[in-house]
Amino acid sequence: TLPAAPGASAGSPDGRLSTTRVSPDAEVITQVMARLSGARRPIIIVGYGAREAMDEVVALAESLNAPVLTTFKAKGQIADDHPLAAGVLGRSGTPVASWFMNECDLILAFGASFSNHTGIEPSKPIIQVDFDRMALAKFHRVEIPVWGEIGTTAHRLAELSKSISPGNEQKTELAERWAIWREEKHSRLADDHGKGINSASVFAALGNAIPGDAIIAVDVGNNTYSFGRYFESQGQRILMSGYLGSIGFAFPAAMGAWAATQDQPENSGRKVVSISGDGGF
């Protein structure tokens, strides 16, 4: 450490950092609105990069009546009981999200990775919004790459989308698809294949046991795939290391989350849950 004069105050970022509220070019916004206006079945996909801008993204989804799918790492950023939530997409995901991916005619992605694990279909027309320019079209070409801060961009699009008159068909279909999936999950509760408690039972019980403000640390492996597929988020804060190769993450992460929050008056007593397989634990 460097010595400081008695009574010296800490420095600030003033004069060193500019605003992060980067707005896309007006011409790009015009292109995006033209595609949104012509789409009959748009969907929104959010990744972990959109975690601080979900209020703006959900407001945009509501103005478009567009289903919101999440990547696995973004699970919980929109509660599964929201009328426009479609759950997780990809190998760890729900058949609800998969169905809407197949049926959509336009993808609007915010802060999402396009790795193979996410399940985003590259042949679909894609508008990709990201604050990180290096993330745009990183894996393949997209129809409209949009460089901008996610909250600022989503808010701007939501304001302009007020002139669009979306139908309610997709919202109705969401309710129908969730009903089908929940019925299927219920049927799996009693089907253990002779191997004891199954994943559907574990995560149905967990969903009933923990409050909506809990923190959930998730490990890797089959237990994690099952968590993404079966657990219905109520808005819990979900922590995960990524995808594979980091077995053993959940339990120490849960301890760290507990230690980091319990001294804060607003978080005192907040439940913390660790989800691990036998190898991870």
Model region roles, listed by residue range:
Residues 1-36:
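Conformationally flexible catalytic loops at phosphate/diphosphate-handling active centers
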Residues 6-17, 79-81, 179-190, 235-236:
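Gly-rich Lys/Arg/Thr-decorated short loops/hinges at beta-loop-alpha junctions or inter-strand turns
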Residues 28-42, 60, 101-103, 205-214, ...:
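Glycine-rich phosphate/diphosphate-binding loops that line cofactor/substrate pockets in enzymes
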Residues 40-53:
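Glycine-rich phosphate/diphosphate-binding loops and the adjacent beta-loop-alpha structural elements
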Residues 45-46, 69-71, 109-110, 148, ...:
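General beta-strand structural signal in soluble alpha/beta enzymes
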Residues 45-46, 99-110, 263-281:
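A short, small-residue-rich loop immediately preceding and capping a beta-strand
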Residues 74-177:
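Glycine-rich, acidic loop regions that bind phosphate or pyrophosphate groups
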Residues 178-269:
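Active-site diphosphate/adenylate-binding microenvironment
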